[in-house]
A protein has these predicted regions:
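Short, charged/polar connector segments at secondary-structure boundaries
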Residues: 1-116, 126, 170-183, 211-278
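A short, basic-hydrophobic beta/loop patch
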Residues: 97-113, 119-150
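Short beta-strand segments enriched in small/hydrophobic residues
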Residues: 282-306, 414-420
């Protein structure tokens, strides 16, 4: 009665075997015992009876039945064999009453190897079942590689989510998924949340693979994360399959990007171009049409030194390109719905948009996908998206010099440092400052506080309560603030005395980017790269600078200038030489320097910093929304905090 099913399954097996042989691949099931030593199997741990994804069942525990199945688990033996008769009997049982008894499997690196129940797996795979009940035993791999670290992250994720059917190819994504579905790190999932996520995952998987996702070297989980970053988790539930298909088509480059070993192409300096003629210097390619450029700020210049700096940059652009570019500022975008502010800017016929705060990254990305004719850039760092570009400055170069100034003035006293947010770029600034202080003062200690925890005044008070008078505070002063404490200051009974300050030349940054857009080199960069483009320019490009007070001793001013020239020429590298973390781990020894990618991805603090990365729950609302967008990777952040706590 069920012979026809067996014949069809056998044909699938024969086809798979031929395909594997033609490609030089092993055509049968993998055998766990062939690559896992017996002593490791003996030390395996019981997981219990769980539902496992059938697609992740890839082989057998022992070699007894290996050649009875092709690599796709379809049967190869003749239909007259006892094996075939048992297969067809199970086929009937499945169709009439269902196969309920759990199989027995060994799990290794999220793949399952059957100890008992191979034919049940074969039958259920033939009929397209998604999961199967299994009594599982887990064999843990040795740690040390990126692959195993991702695996251990999946185990941590499974503890509180009970989700075991999604996998990723990059570290940190399980905790990123936890955030994207609206859960706090470590927060347990309810049964309803698991059902809803399972439904969303398999709906997305069906559409994504039908669209061609199987051709990409990308896990379904990677693709789903990329989708959710643009459209959100809730929208995945509400959209029909046809709507999901349309959305996937719009962001296909976000999926192909996931195939890259390194997702981001850091542009460390502006493109070197031939000097244009007088007319083209202002407006390349002889364009006569006036361009409209929008600057969308999360706050207002009167309330935020950061926004005030970007507003000065906009005014610089307006002056330099007068008559050729018109700029418009949109303030307080985060006071309401920032997506509506972006839409209004587009309705106002702006074709180039700068969103000047990291927490507007998500809405900027969504707008860029929906409006491919509009050029959108977001002021943030280390974000992997093809449809927008990010820009930030290597402020750590200036902070290294300021740290050296502080170290030279501190003597035997500690120095204070107040940081805004634990985000990409700012961790490097903390460490560069501390290393600069240590370079001139080997015993220098830097006490770290956060303005995103109870505000700037509270952070300053915590330092002064320790008797610390030399403090590096916010980079930019709020023009309406009563106190103009910024940069490196000496706190006296009569008030702060400013000694040195970092300067962001946003006008130079915006002018250079706009020239690249107008002369088409901006588009050429996109076409020549398959990665996400992040601009990360430094002192040499003129986008950041150091101003020193005349109150500084002459020798200290000369030291600062010497270091500035060294950094601009590439001779002086802030992260060169032996580096050691707070927990004692040596990052590298003498004669080496961190790569730009390592600098950007810092989630650890050097050994002369006293303090920690703040806990998420301690942050202000603005701090949380900023960290949600561009915070250091949660997995490594949480791990580094735990390591530091355990070492104290």
């Amino acid at each position: 009665m069920y012979t026809q099913y067996y014949k069809e399954a056998q044909k699938l097996a024969q086809k798979e075997r031929r395909r594997c042989i033609s490609r030089g691949q092993y055509p049968y099931l993998s055998v766990l015992d062939d690559f896992i030593p017996a002593e490791k199997s003996a030390a395996a741990t019981e997981v219990g009876t769980i539902q496992i994804p059938i697609e992740w069942i890839v082989g057998t525990k022992t070699g007894g039945r290996t050649t009875a199945f092709a690599r796709n688990y379809m049967p190869l033996l003749d239909e007259s064999t006892e094996f075939a008769a048992k297969w067809m009997k199970l086929c009937g049982a499945h169709l009439e009453e269902g196969l309920r008894d759990p199989i027995e499997v060994y799990e290794y690196m999220n793949r399952y190897y059957v100890a008992e129940g191979n034919k049940r797996v074969s039958v259920l795979k033939y009929f397209g079942a998604v999961t199967i009940a299994a009594h599982a035993v887990r064999i843990l791999p040795e740690r040390g590689s990126q692959e195993t670290e991702i695996y251990y992250e999946s185990l941590d994720f499974n503890k509180y989510s009970k989700i075991n059917f999604i996998e990723f190819s990059h570290p940190g994504r399980y905790l990123e998924l936890q955030r994207l579905v609206g859960k706090k790190p470590g927060e347990a999932w309810t049964e309803e949340e698991r059902r809803n996520f399972s439904s969303a995952y398999y709906r997305f998987k069906k559409v994504y693979e039908a669209k061609g996702g199987k051709r990409l070297l990308v896990t379904v989980g990677d693709a789903m994360i990329a989708y959710m970053k643009v459209y959100g988790y809730q929208e995945l539930h509400s959209k029909s399959e046809q709507e999901i298909k349309k959305s996937i088509g719009k962001i296909w480059e976000e999926f192909t990007l996931q195939q890259e070993d390194s997702l981001i192409d850091l542009k460390l300096a502006p493109n070197q171009e031939k000097k244009p003629g007088i007319l083209l210097k202002i407006l390349p390619n002889g364009e006569s049409k006036e361009r409209r450029v929008a600057f969308i700020n999360d706050k207002s210049p009167s309330d935020s030194g950061w926004t005030y700096g970007h507003e000065l940059g906009r005014l610089h652009v307006q002056q330099v390109f007068h008559g050729h570019i018109t700029t418009t500022a949109y303030h307080d975008a985060m006071a309401g719905d920032p997506s509506q502010v972006i839409e209004q800017a587009i309705k106002d016929k702006n074709t180039i948009l700068f969103t000047t705060a990291p927490r507007m990254l998500s809405v900027s990305l969504r707008a860029a996908v929906e409006h491919p004719e509009i050029t959108i850039l977001n002021c943030s760092l280390n974000k992997s998206h093809r449809y927008i570009r990010t820009y930030y400055a290597r402020m750590y170069e200036v902070k290294f010099i300021i740290g050296a100034i502080a170290g030279s003035l501190a003597g035997g006293h500690p120095v204070g440092y107040i940081c805004n947010y634990p985000i990409f770029g700012q961790i490097a600034e903390i460490n560069a400052f501390a290393l600069g202080a240590k370079m001139v003062n080997p015993n220098a200690k830097v006490y770290l506080e956060w303005s995103c925890v109870n505000g700037l005044s509270a952070a300053t008070q915590r330092l002064t309560d320790r008797g610390i008078a030399l403090i590096s505070s916010q980079d930019l002063a709020n023009p309406n603030a009563e106190s103009y404490t910024f940069g490196l200051s000496h706190i006296t009974k009569d008030g702060p005395v400013n000694l040195a300050m970092p300067v962001w030349h946003w006008g130079v940054y915006y002018e250079t980017i706009l020239r690249h857009i107008l002369n088409r080199s901006f588009q050429s960069e996109y076409e020549e790269s398959t990665k996400a483009l992040n601009y990360y320019w430094g002192m040499e490009a003129g986008v950041v600078e150091l101003f020193c007070s005349k109150r500084l001793p002459d020798g200290t001013q000369k030291l600062a200038e010497f270091l500035r020239q060294g950094i601009c020429s590439g001779i002086c590298k802030p992260f060169y030489g032996p580096l050691c973390r707070q927990d004692g781990q040596v990052i590298h020894k003498e004669g080496h320097s961190l790569s730009p990618e390592q600098i950007v991805n810092m989630d650890w603090l050097v050994d002369n910093v006293i303090g920690d990365l703040p806990d998420y729950e301690q942050l202000t609302d603005v701090g949380k929304s900023t960290v949600d967008m561009v915070g250091v990777e949660p997995s490594t952040k949480d791990r580094s905090i735990k390591e530091r706590q355990s070492s104290t």
